[in-house]
């Protein structure tokens, strides 16, 4: 496998996960996009905002390509207090989705322009680990996005029962009801 085909494969996997994350917002109210669904406040719009922040950082700033748009929560360091993980009342979902799409475009330019072995520096990592490569950061971003796409699938399912992308391909409502009953019986055997 050549470096360029590996880069193309990583880019494809990244885009599939990006698309999956945004698909979890479809058809939801502003409230449902924003409301915390777990004890750690996981929410769909916050996942999108976080991923936009991470892409601008890892696939932009760390390779000498600063974000073309301001990220106030990075500039004022409130990101360190979780400000990238939720949407303020005055931040529109359209703004956050567009911020994520802008991060994609910026990252896609990095992917097109940089070799996987291009040097990179992550200033917020411990000094002994700061020097790395673009390829390492691209793999990290693919993993980060896939990780949060899974969170988005589960969060969406908690909101309205809509599962991941292949949920309906696996079975209809009755199939899922029977499946959940089987899984519950197996768990109940260990009460």
Over which residues does each language-model region extend?
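Short, contiguous alpha-helical
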Residues: 7, 11-25, 30-81, 122-191
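Glycine-rich, acidic and aromatic/proline-enriched surface loops and short helix-turn segments
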Residues: 109-116
């Amino acid at each position: 496998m050549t470096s360029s085909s590996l880069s193309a494969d990583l880019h494809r996997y990244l885009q599939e996960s990006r698309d999956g994350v945004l698909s979890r917002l479809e058809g939801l109210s502003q409230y449902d996009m924003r409301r915390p669904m777990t004890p750690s406040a996981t929410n769909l719009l916050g996942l999108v905002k976080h991923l936009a922040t991470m892409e601008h950082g890892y696939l932009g700033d760390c390779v000498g390509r600063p974000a073309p748009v301001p990220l106030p929560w990075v500039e004022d360091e409130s990101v360190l207090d979780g400000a990238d993980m939720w949407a303020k009342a005055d931040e529109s979902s359209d703004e956050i989705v567009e911020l994520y799409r802008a991060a994609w475009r910026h990252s896609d330019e990095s992917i097109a322009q940089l070799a996987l072995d291009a040097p990179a520096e992550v200033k917020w990592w411990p000094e002994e680990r700061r020097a790395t490569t673009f390829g390492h950061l691209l793999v990290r971003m693919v993993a980060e996005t896939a990780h949060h796409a899974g969170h988005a699938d589960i969060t969406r399912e908690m909101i309205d029962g809509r599962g991941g992308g292949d949920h309906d391909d696996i079975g209809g409502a009755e199939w899922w009801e029977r499946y959940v009953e089987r899984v519950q019986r197996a768990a109940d055997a260990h009460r």
